[in-house]
Amino acid sequence: MAGGHRLLLENARQVVLVCARGERFLTRDALRSLEVLEGASLVVGTDGFIKAIGPADAIQKQFSEETFEERIDCSGKCILPGLVDAHTHPVWAGERVHEFAMKLAGATYMDIHQAGGGINFTVERTRQASEEELYSSFQQRLGCMMRAGTTLVECKSGYGLNLETELKMLRVIERARQELDIGISATYCGAHSVPKGKTASEAADDIIKNHLPRLKELGRNGEIHVDNIDVFCEKDVFDLDSTRRILQSGKDIGLQINFHGDELHPMKAAELGVELGAQAISHLEEVSDEGIAAMASARCSAVLLPTTAYMLRLKQPRARKMLDEGVIVALGSDFNPNAYCFSMPMVMHLACVNMRMSMPEALAAATINAAYALGKSHTQGSLEVGKQGDLIIINSPRWEHLIYQFGGHHELIDYVIAKGKVIYKK
């Protein structure tokens, strides 16, 4: 019996499925060659989920009596899953372009931080900004990410450090989640820095006694939806004990643990994350061998951020060792005032050049594995029947051009589609 569907993508040169057997993540040998169909078509239903993928002639025959709200001829082009950005700080006021000049002159991240710059500078301006001002700039930033192919993005609070401003940021994120087409995973990051006038232990007490109970209440009322809890576990910021207390308290109210660890100093944050059952740990430039082995065994995702290592001139995360040992490696842009990058294609390119990842490894890390880091790989991160119709169409006969063409994604990306709806067309 004939029926209606939302979208038919016809005659693509390549359809990059990434996965084809319902995998929730890819490691080791599964990353050597991703699942790719040649000369294929794809159907998205009116519910926004993929209904069929296969050879173009077979799809044409199967759906010859069906109607579609939209058809797109993909001849000579490639269809890929929408990209997933597993780590961003996109809600803030007060740019820090002046600090870039300081870094170029030799100042370190912690030099700037201890001089009252860095996070502290942004916190002051974010506290002063209205909710509407924050939403306006956030919406523009999400638009830039979406035009670069991102269809699911993790969004952190963390430039408030007091309950009032953290909730203001989370309301901004919730509004975007409700109103915009891009997918959002919301993260409470009230432990991004220790507020002036408090010790790490005092800040942790405030978060545990005041912030988290309020988040639980607002979540129960349906006012704010938060998925993850984050802490900046670092020397002279939050030590292991404070980090453990905050993360465990967040887990106790149902939040996934997804935190900053082992970035500037070896803290044994990876080992702590595994102990607490973390879904993901980000940065990991200074992770220990034991931490890598523990993360691999626990299926705890490593969210690597090549932009940060590049811009701060840090040593690169040991992606190659993590991949070889079976860690679930994901990628994020770390978009923030200190690492101003919207583009996951650029992140993938940097991962390949600076972290020695292959192009299939980088694409998996920016799709299925990034979705896994956010607890979303059952619905997003690959092109499979039953998953959300989140995808991009690039004007190239080979998918690798999305990574190969450094900085050229605006010329490549013809369409960005979320749940079968075209949200960007060049």
Swiss-Prot record:
Which InterPro entries does this one have?
Answer: Amidohydro-rel, HutI, Metal-dep_hydrolase_composite, Metal_Hydrolase
Identify the EC number(s). 3.5.2.7
Domain of life according to the entry: Eukaryota
**One annotated Gene Ontology cellular component of this protein:** cytoplasm
Cofactor note from UniProt?
Binds 1 zinc or iron ion per subunit.
Give me any GO biological process, just one: L-histidine catabolic process
- Ligand binding (Fe(3+)): H260, D334
Q: Which SUPFAM superfamilies match?
A: Composite domain of metallo-dependent hydrolases, Metallo-dependent hydrolases
Q: Which residues bind 4-imidazolone-5-propanoate?
A: Y159, H192, E263
Entry's transmembrane regions = none
* Entry keywords, A to Z: Histidine metabolism, Hydrolase, Iron, Metal-binding, Zinc
Q: Which GO terms describe its molecular function?
A: imidazolonepropionase activity; metal ion binding
> Which residues are listed for N-formimidoyl-L-glutamate binding in this entry?
Y159, N336
Task: Name its co-factor(s).
Answer: Zn(2+); Fe(3+)
Q: What does the entry list as the binding residues for Zn(2+)?
A: H260, D334
Q: Which biological pathway?
A: Amino-acid degradation; L-histidine degradation into L-glutamate; N-formimidoyl-L-glutamate from L-histidine: step 3/3
Catalyses which reaction?
4-imidazolone-5-propanoate + H2O = N-formimidoyl-L-glutamate
Give the family per the record: Belongs to the metallo-dependent hydrolases superfamily. HutI family.
Query: What is the protein's given name?
Result: Probable imidazolonepropionase
